[in-house]
Amino acid sequence: MKVTPLMEQYLRIKEQYKDSILLFRLGDFYEAFFEDAKIVSKVLNIVLTRRQDAPMAGIPYHALNSYLKKLVEAGYKVAICDQMEEPSKSKKLIRREVTRVVTPGSILEDEFLSETNNYMAVVSEEKGQYCTIFCDVSTGEVLVHESSDEQETMDLLKNYSISQIVCPDHLKPSLKERFPGVYTESISEWYFSDLEEVEKAYNLKDIHHFELSSLALKTLAALIKYVKYTMITEELNLKPPLLISQRDYMILDSATVENLSLIPGDRGKNLFDVLNNTETPMGARLLKKWILHPLVDRKQIEERLETVEKLVSDRMNLEELRDLLSNVRDVERIVSRVEYNRSVPRDLVALRETLEIIPKLNEILSTFGVFKNLAFPERLLDLLQRAVEDDPAGSPGEGKVIKRGFSPELDEYRDLLEHAEERLKEFEEKERKRTGIQKLKVGYNQVFGYYIEVTKANLDKIPDDYERKQTLVNSERFITPELKEFETKIMAAKERIEELEKELFKNVCEEVKKHKEILLKISEELAKIDVLSTLAYDAILYSYTKPIFSEGRLEIKGGRHPIVERFTQNFVENDIYMDNERRFVVITGPNMSGKSTFIRQVGLISLMAQIGSFVPAQKAILPVFDRIFTRMGARDDLAGGRSTFLVEMNEMALILLKSTEKSLVLLDEVGRGTSTQDGVSIAWAISEELIKRGCKVLFATHFTELTELEKHFPQVQNKTILVKEEGKNVIFTHKVVDGVADRSYGIEVAKIAGIPDRVINRAYEILERNFKNNTKKNGKSNRFSQQIPLFPV
C-alpha cells in the first residue's frame, strides 16, 4: 500500500497513542483506521469501509459526543485528533493534533455525567504504605488517603464508586482482579518522580505547604501528570488536596457502607436517596461525602446541628431559600469546562443565572444569623449580561452567541449579512432595468458563489461587463465587477463574524478564568448551604428531632429506621439505653421479627447525628463514635475464593483489630457459617473480647446460649422482640423488650414464606418428637441444648 502524506500524518500521531483508539478528523468526519476501525465499527454498529486497502470507520463530527460515550462505556481510551487550521486557508496538508484523551475518569461533558462525582483514583504503594488520591476532573476535587492497611484502601475505593483506577505496573493485576468492572490503567514510575509538577500546578514555593507525606506528594505528582496528558494542557483546574484523616472524619469500611445501605448500590433503597432533597448538583455531591465521612469532632457536629436548628425554626425563609437554590446551576463543573477550554455558550448563561441570584440569596441568608454573605463578582456578572445572548444558538462563530451591542464591529458585519438579501433584490431589480431582461435572476451556490442567470433567449441583451461563469442547458450564468465586490464583502463578513465571535467568546471565558477562585468559593458555600437547608427540610418533612451528645450515654426514645419507615406503613418505634456500665446488648428473637432492622437503625441514627442531621426519634442522646462497624448477613466471595464463614471471620478480624472504646459495633448472626458448637464458641469468645475493649455492641443472634453472658458480665443486657401467639398463628410486634426469646418460630416463618402445608405439618411432627426425646434424655426441657437433629437417629 502506497502511503500518502495524510496517512503518514495519521501513522505518526497513532504511534504516540498506541493504547488509544485514535479518532482522526477528516473534514466533517472523525475517522478510525486499521484495528481501531474494526473496534469502532463493532462497538458503534457502523459500517466498516476501506481507504487504500486500510479498514476505515467514520462518525460525523457534530455527533462525536454520543459515539464517544459508547466507546468509553465499552472500556476504551479514545484520543481525539482535530484539524488545527481551516482547510480553506491551507494549501498544504492540514495540521492535526490530539486535543484530548478521553477515559472514564477524565470526562467533562454534562451529557456523559450524572450529578454525582466521577472519581478517578490514583493508587500507589511503597513498603506496605498505600496512598490513594481521588480526583473528580469535572469539579477539580482532590482527596488524599493514606494507610498501611490494604483492606482499608480497598474499602475506600469501593465506597467512592470510582470510574477509573490509575496505578503503577506492579499494582494493576491485583486491582484489576478486585475491581473487574473498573477501567484500570497502569503508568510508568516516572509519573511519580517529578515533584516539580506539584509546585507548578499549585504555584507553590515550598512543596511541603500541603503537609503531605513523600508518598502522597509522589502520587499527587502522578495525578497532575496524568490529567495533563488526558487534557493536553498545562493549565489545570485542581483544588488543593484535602486529606481524609481519621482525626477529622469517621472512616467507614465497605461492609458498613453496604450493610447500612448508606449510598446507592445493589441493595435498592438507601440513606442518601432518603435524605437527598438537595436543590443543586453541588449539594447532592456534598451530601454523599458527608454521609461517607461523618465528623468525629463534637464541636463541628454541634455547629452543623445549630445551623440546621436555625433553619428549621424559620420555615418561611427556609422555603424561600430552597426556591432560590433551585435556580443555581452546577458552578463547579462549569468552571472546570471553562478552565479546560471545553465550555459551551450555555455554560456562561448558566453561570450568569447563578450569579444573578446571589444578592437575593444574601438577603435571605442574613435572616438566619448563621451564614456569611456570599461573594458577589459584580463586574463578571455585568460582562456576562452584556456579552452573551440569553438563549444562544449554535456554537461560537455562527453569529448567534454574542449579544448585539457588545461589539460594534461584529454588529456591522452582522448587519451586512442580514441586509444581504435585500441588497441582492435591489441589485437584481437594477440589472433588469439596465438590461431590459425581465426574467434575469440573481442567485448563489456553494461552488460558483453569486451569479446572474440569463435565459438563452435573452443572451443578445447582456452588457459587455457581464463575465460568463457557467453554461447550462437553457441558460447561462454571469458575474459583474459589482456583484464580485458584493460577494467578496459577504464572504469576508462571514469569515470575520466567525473569527470575531470566537475571539469574543474566548475573551469572556478568559475573564471567567480570572474569577476561578471566587467562583469555586461561591460553589463550595452554595453546596454547604444547600446540604444544611436540605437537612432542615428533611427534619420537618420526616419529623426528625435534634440529637444531643454526651460522653458515654446512648439513649434513643421512639427510634425509627430512616429508610424502612419511608416504605413501610405503621413503623414500630423502639427504645434503647446503653452507657459505659451497660454497653453490650444481646438481642434474640425469630427471623422476620425485626432484630436486624433494630440494630441497623441504631447505627443509622448515630451516623446521621454525626453528619449534622436531625434523627428519626422522639429523643436521642448519643456519644460521638470514632467508628461504626458492622458484621451482618451471609455472603461469600467466590471471585476471591472465600467462603461465607471466611468472609465473616475476615470482617470480625477487622473489627477486633480496629475497634476502640469509642466505637459502635453492630453484629448480626456471627458464627452461623460453621457448626453450632464452633459458632457458639467463637461468638462467645468474640463477645468477651468486645466487652473487655469497652465499645458499645448490639449483637443480634439466634444463639440463645449467648444470653448467658448477662450472668457473667454486668455490662451485658438481654433484649428480645415481642412475639404474640394466637392459636397456630404468630404476630411479630417488632417491639424490643427486655428478656430472652424462648422460641425461634422458624416453622411459622417458613409458613409465612409459603412453604407447602404438608412440609409445615411434617416439620411440626419432627419438632415435637425431638422435643420429647430431648426432654426424656435430659429430664427437662433445655433451651440451651445443641441443635436438634432433623431426623431420628
UniProtKB/Swiss-Prot annotation:
Pfam families: MutS_I (PF01624), MutS_II (PF05188), MutS_III (PF05192), MutS_IV (PF05190), MutS_V (PF00488). This is DNA mismatch repair protein MutS. SUPFAM superfamilies: DNA repair protein MutS, domain I, DNA repair protein MutS, domain II, DNA repair protein MutS, domain III, P-loop containing nucleoside triphosphate hydrolases. Belongs to the DNA mismatch repair MutS family. One of its GO terms (cellular component) is cytosol. One of its GO terms (biological process) is mismatch repair. It comes from the Bacteria. Signal peptide: none annotated. It comes from Thermotoga petrophila (strain ATCC BAA-488 / DSM 13995 / JCM 10881 / RKU-1). Keywords: ATP-binding, DNA damage, DNA repair, DNA-binding, Nucleotide-binding. GO terms for molecular function: ATP binding; ATP-dependent DNA damage sensor activity; damaged DNA binding; mismatched DNA binding. This protein is involved in the repair of mismatches in DNA. It is possible that it carries out the mismatch recognition step. This protein has a weak ATPase activity. ATP binds at G589, P590, N591, M592, S593, G594, K595, S596. PROSITE patterns: DNA_MISMATCH_REPAIR_2. HAMAP family: MutS.
